[in-house]
Amino acid sequence: MSLYQRYLSKSLIFIFSLFFLILFFLESSIGFKYFFNFTNYFFIGLKTEEISGNWRDFKLKKINFNIFGTSIKAESVHIITDPISLFKVSTILKKIKTKNLVISFNKKIKKVALKNNFLKEKKIKNTIFFKHSLILRKIYSDKILLKTQKKNIFLFGVFSGLQLSNDTCTFLPTKINSIYIDSSMRNVKNIDNKKSNFFIKKDIFYRNKIDNALSFFSIFKNFFIPININLINLKCNQLKFFNRTFLDIYKIKMSAQLKKNILKIKKIQIYSKYFKTKSKGKIFFRSDFSIFFIVKNEMSINIINNKAMNLLFKDTIDHKLNFKSNNLIKFNIHGEISLDDLNYPIHINLHLNRLFLPISKNLILSSKNFNFSLKGKINNYFLSLKNIINISGMPSFFISISAIGNIQNVVIKKIHFFPFFKEIKTKKFIKIKKEIDYNKYITQLAGKMRILSDFNKQSSNIFLPYFHVYGDFMRKKISVLGSLYYRKLNGITIPRINFLLGKNKGHISGSISKKVNLRSSIYANNLNYFSPNLKGIIKATLNIYSFCSLPSFSSVILGQKINWKNILYFNNIKITTNGNLKKSFPNKFFADFKNIRFSKFHINSLHIKSDWNNINQKFSLSLKDKKLSITFILNGHLNRKVGIWKGVLKKIDVKTSWGQWISRNNPLIFYHIKNSINFKNIKKIKNKNAFYSAINNIQTSLFKLIRQSPVKFQTDLFFNTQFQWKLRENITNLKLFLKGSNINLEKKIKEKIMFEKISAVNLYINFKKNNFITKWIIKKSKNSLKVNKISGFLNIYDFFHEKKIEGKVFLSDFSCSFLNFFENFFTKIQGKFSGNINFLGTIYQPQISADINFQDFYIKSDKIFKYMLLFFCSFPNKIENIKINQEIIMKKGNALFKLNSVVKNNISHIKWNILFHSNKLAIVLFPKIKLNFSSQLNLYYFLSKYDLIGYLKFSFFSFKINEKNFLF
């Protein structure tokens, strides 16, 4: 072997040994750490607290890096390399994963003149040139914060890739879960998640924001990008602006390419709550430092029925922003904004060849040659609008608006509009008075309006401290004077709005927010204003209240001496209504007409009243005249157990000069409720001759009641009723009002006669479409110092389907002696009770709760001992045959009752519980045997079984009760 070959072989051995040692050194964690720190110290300048792994897969923790005034920090960076690619032209990093990456732009961007003070374009291109390709296949970051002095931009869940080759930077398909934009007026310490509390409030920004926006255009119109950028596909699922939720965007899709200072927008799609846009076009960064753009857009806005509009933006940005936008079909806009003058003079004109806005299917707003103009400065401008507006189904009208304003305030100088009813002969608004023949029904509005808008707080306020509408409309003089305030947090406030319709006066006041509370009234003594030859006086009030989504209303209409052409005359009118807009009809209705004349026909009085409850339905009508008297009462009853609804003519009383016809308790209509479990499908029982059957029952029902009942009943009743029903259809409308007075009850038991008197009974029922509303009052005595009455309401909503119930009963020192007439188990009952009963749920699954107080209660019977023994299984059965006179006396007591339904095996079961308590009880077995005691008893029922738990405490002993699972 020659000397040359010997040295060559030794050199190769040495080189391979050295290469192996270096490779072994880099493969070890300690060796790679020393190698990274050495190269980092001389070349990179990256600071890190911990290094782990080797040159193929390594992880850096808590890094800090500064370059060109930009600070980069991260909690950790994990990099996986492709070792083979290090020896090729293209270097590949398989994966880069960062955690809590923060990029801070610390230095301000200063305005520069690239023509004189910046590097030449060619020099920059030579400087920024990627001689070796670098490919980052997968880039993932859980959280990225981009910090500037005035903005914080948070990116969550970023998946991307990057390729640098020659002078091109390519972003591989990129996905971002969410982006949040907020102010950076305070330090952000932690980045936890998208719900983290590092978003803060901002100061008012009006002038500064405009300065920054216009300065941006004036600076960056002179800027060019020295490299080519290719964005293959970008998708962002959410973009949010904190404290400006109205700008939130649901989804963004983007694809673009920047090559040789030409930005080609392949696709931009933006989806928001209020609009959707699709855009494509080109932006040219010219060598004379001007920017030319042409962008085609397709936009749809929700408030105008999502109708698509095609827009074309085409113009040049230089020292001034001159812009033009042409709708490919219907409109164009052009204007001018200075980018160099701090006063920012502006001039914007909007012209629409044809405006077409379908607000709804039957309401369309349109206008030809629509013009809008805004001139002046940002903080001192003038705007005007003059156009003819057409609304479907209404006359066209001309409107002219002129106003002045600044950033915070808009003052409307004048709003002028008038309708016309003949064909338009010209499009020139200047000559409109001369060239258009229209009816001069002119209405003018003059006033002031102040608009306050703070985007940081998401609040907008509109104040109208004074406005006045006056003039003629349809040859009728009108005048409206008042004030109006709108605050986003509190809604609309109306201190008072007064209006004059001729000589008729009225007013409106109240507020509208989540809840509405409006009060209005009108006093009309000039009825000829509304209809010719109409005379009289009308007073009316209307109140609207409760939630805006489900408002309720009540109204009262009073009329005096209403006369129309001496044909129709009402001496007195009273109409009251109460309702809820969800039900679309009055819940309560009462109408009272007195001294009615129609031509030669005369009526002394007419009363109509109606109301409902979930079991009994009533409707009343009463008409009285000298020769004719009609009283009509219609009742209905629902028996849920057997699934039958029954309609009964409670009373028909017709009196004429020829005689009187009276009928009571005549069954008229029957419904059978199929499937007693769900009670949803209601069908009428087939009866070929239902009307004949009803007439036949009239002859016997009253006499049958008199013969069988031991109770004599006497009263003065009056009712008003309305009933609407179509054959083979559900009842759609029923209203009834029943008023009874001087009600006398008489019952004879064992040669003893009992009397009871009830002073008044009022019942109001209203059933319409699918809801059943009732209200009632029973007064025991008019002369009593205490209230002494029962009142309440019981309503059924969605009667033919869900049958939801809601009701309350109020007991106010009401005497229970009337119970003697409706039961046969006790000889005598006396006392008073008070409290309330609540009803909820549905008819099939009711929920009832009651709280009843007893006072001076007295029960006498020879069966009390028998009923008490039912709860004690251990007593002999024959002891119940002992009959002695027994009395129970209770000075005070209380009973709590709860009833619920439980669904078991698709069957609804009722369970209830009664808790009784009294400290002052006495039982009298014989005239001389009286035992005083106190008691607390809890009776529980479920699945036909009872539990009784409690005690009876006497003077010398106490008796505990614990009986369970017994049957009656």
UniProtKB/Swiss-Prot annotation:
Family: To E.coli YtfN.
Keywords assigned: Membrane, Transmembrane, Transmembrane helix
Lineage, top ranks: Bacteria, Pseudomonadati, Pseudomonadota, Gammaproteobacteria, Enterobacterales
GO CC, alphabetical: membrane
Protein name from the UniProt record: Uncharacterized protein BUsg_080
Membrane topology summary: Single-pass membrane protein
Record localization: Membrane
Positions of transmembrane segments: 12-32
